[in-house]
Curated annotation (Swiss-Prot):
InterPro entries: EF-4 (IPR006297), EFG_III/V (IPR035647), EFG_V-like (IPR000640), EFTu-like_2 (IPR004161), G_TR_CS (IPR031157), LepA_C_sf (IPR038363), LepA_CTD (IPR013842), LepA_IV (IPR035654). GO terms for biological process: positive regulation of translation. Its EC number is 3.6.5.n1. Pfam families: EFG_C (PF00679), GTP_EFTU (PF00009), GTP_EFTU_D2 (PF03144), LepA_C (PF06421). It comes from Geobacillus kaustophilus (strain HTA426). This is Elongation factor 4. It is an enzyme of class 3 (hydrolase).
Length: 609
């Protein structure tokens, strides 16, 4: 193509993504758009076409990004090229959302006509506004009997501050309003700006590993053109590769001759390691590099850590390979080897949040068939030592001695909770129980309230989300963002079994709730650890001071059974002999800790009702 043709084509490109809270109909709307533009035949259509991972379809959530190229013949007779970039809606994947938004010029904001705006919608809308996108509000599910489009329209204006007077009323399920949305995309969303003759700049917004072609990078071309045979360079690492193939998605991959300004597609360049295609990085031409990379690339820092150990220690290498393979598609997953006396060899893994952690665990078990033991999740604490140095601790077993610690700081998050006003009381109680500080409260309308709290991340990591859902009968929605570190009165608690520390059960807890927490855990472990031939004390200790204890009683044979009548001294002799034996066993005996015990530590609800 010459310059004229490229520019003409560029004017007809529209790049957009769809923002919505879970279950507001985003994937269904994407299906309808695919159908309307003829990207898929009736036969190929299935629910949630873009959610390709089995897990995504099962949970009904979008985890990875997907991009599709569509052609749409508008009412003005022109044929437009649409790139729909599907984004995850969940808070753990905020970075995925922000990069997919960076690859667009516009976003469709889908809001459920019955439920109104939810916490995650807000978070993603603000990301879109930060990326200067044109936002088209769509009120979905208007076919529901409980739909109140006018109330929702008002809410969009009041809460987000968007003009929703011309919001499209639609129902993706029934197919109402889809044409109108497509026309609005043509009319409202700007064409990509960029120069096809400038040095190449392409944003990597995702990457995936293909065993035959190496890494496939998903890119959005911002300036310049890329074609096979060209040498390219990654701007954050400076590594160079030669492009072997470029193409677009029509959901399936389709090879094309070149990708130019505004195109969303993929390229392969015999890249062996996915670490070389960092998400958010800029690809440029090796011979004629761009002066500076595209903004918005940042290295992802994991927020939540946990240990993962194979139940069968022989599969340690399989686990490493599995984690490496998952890391190919998931730039946010971090892991490094660690050992534990109780669990043997395993890995310390870092995740973006709890959902991310659960999904990785599930994928390891499903796709790689590795049975895992996972330890309690923890966050990164900043520990200031008395000699003036500062260390980051993400594993409770690495916590320095209490004598050396000057103060410990922990990460705090700003939690935005949307809740029906009947449940404001229980939710505020929950947040205070989790050491939250009240920041703000706004009534969105007569039925719903937005609460803002600053809460330590470590409290959210446990079971905050479940507790929130059960306290509000599932009506609350919740979103959080990191706001920084604050000093807290924290201590490390160890669990001792038969006088030995079980390193995998150590955790860090606030001093005020240490006693209750310790008591609850030893009681729980007493029920979960199978009884041994000897008596086993279970203790919770802070430093050298034991603060809670319970005892797992010994299993014992009735040695007096064969005595019938008999002299008391004979009975006493047998009992003493049994006692001696138990004592000897206790000295050399070791206790097996079942998998449930590690999970129980996470599930303990500190607020004993």
């Amino acid at each position: 193509m010459n310059r004229e043709e490229r520019l003409k084509r560029q004017e007809r490109i529209r790049n957009f993504s769809i923002i919505a809270h879970i279950d507001h109909g985003k994937s269904t709307l994407a299906d309808r758009i695919l159908e309307k533009t003829g990207a898929l035949s009736e036969r190929e259509l299935r629910e949630q076409t873009l959610d390709t991972m089995e897990l995504e379809r099962e949970r009904g959530i979008t985890i990875k990004l997907n991009a599709v190229q569509l052609t749409y013949k508008a009412k003005n007779g022109e044929e437009y090229i649409f790139h729909l970039i599907d984004t995850p809606g969940h808070v753990d994947f905020t970075y995925e959302v922000s990069r997919s938004l960076a690859a667009c010029e516009g976003a469709i904001l889908v809001v459920d006509a019955a439920q109104g705006i939810e916490a995650q919608t807000l978070a993603n809308v603000y990301l879109a506004i930060d990326n200067n996108l044109e936002i088209l509000p769509v009120i979905n599910k208007i076919d529901l009997p409980s739909a109140e489009p006018e109330r929702v329209r008002q809410e969009i204006e009041d809460v987000i501050g968007l003009d929703a007077s011309d919001a499209v009323l639609a129902s993706a399920k029934v197919g109402i309003g889809i044409e109108e949305i497509l026309e609005k995309i043509v009319e409202k969303i700007p064409a990509p700006s960029g120069d096809p003759d400038a040095p190449l700049k392409a944003l990597i917004f995702d990457s995936l590993y293909d065993p035959y072609r190496g890494v496939v990078a998903y890119v959005r071309v911002v300036d310049g053109t890329v074609k096979p045979g060209q040498r390219i360079k990654m701007m954050s690492t400076g590594k160079e590769f030669e492009v072997t193939e470029v193409g677009v998605f029509t959901p399936k991959q389709k090879v094309v001759d070149e990708l130019t300004v505004g195109d969303v597609g993929y390229l392969t360049a015999s890249i062996k390691n996915v670490k070389d295609t960092r998400v958010g990085d800029t690809i440029t031409d090796a011979e004629r590099p761009a002066a500076e990379p595209l903004p918005g690339y940042r290295k992802l820092n994991p927020m939540v850590f946990c240990g993962m150990y194979p139940i069968d220690t022989a599969r340690y290498n399989d686990l490493r390979e599995a984690l490496e393979k998952l890391q190919l598609n998931d730039a946010a997953l971090h892991f490094e080897p660690e050992t534990s006396q109780a669990l043997g060899f395993g890995f310390r893994c870092g995740f973006l949040g709890l959902l991310h952690m659960e999904i990785i665990q599930e994928r390891l078990e499903r796709e790689f068939h590795i049975d895992l033991i996972t330890t309690a999740p923890s966050v990164v604490y900043k520990v200031h030592l008395t000699d003036g140095t500062e260390v980051d601790v993400d594993n409770p077993t690495n916590m320095p001695d209490p004598q050396k610690i000057d103060r410990i700081e922990e990460p705090y998050v700003k939690a935005t909770i949307m809740v029906p006003n009947d449940y404001v009381g229980p939710v505020m109680e929950l947040c205070q129980g989790k050491r939250g500080t009240f920041v703000d409260m706004q009534y969105l309308d007569e039925k719903r309230v937005m609460l803002i709290y600053d809460i330590p991340l470590s409290e959210i990591v446990y079971d905050f989300f479940d507790a929130l859902k059960s306290n509000t009968k599932g009506y609350a929605s919740f979103d959080y963002e990191l706001i920084g570190y604050r000093p807290s009165n924290l201590v490390k608690m160890d669990i001792l079994l038969n006088g030995e520390k079980i390193d995998a059960l150590s955790f860090i807890v606030h001093r005020d709730s240490a006693y209750e927490r310790g008591k609850a855990i030893v009681e729980k472990l007493k029920d979960l650890i199978p009884r041994q031939q000897f008596e086993v004390p279970v203790q919770a200790a802070i430093g050298n001071k034991v603060i809670a204890r319970s005892t797992i009683k010994a299993l014992r044979k009735n040695v007096l059974a064969k005595c019938y009548g008999g002299d008391v001294s004979r009975k006493r002799k047998l009992l003493e002999k049994q006692k001696e034996g138990k004592k000897r066993m206790k000295q050399i005996g070791s206790v097996e800790v079942p998998q449930e015990a590690f999970m129980a530590v996470l599930k303990i609800d500190d607020q004993k009702k």
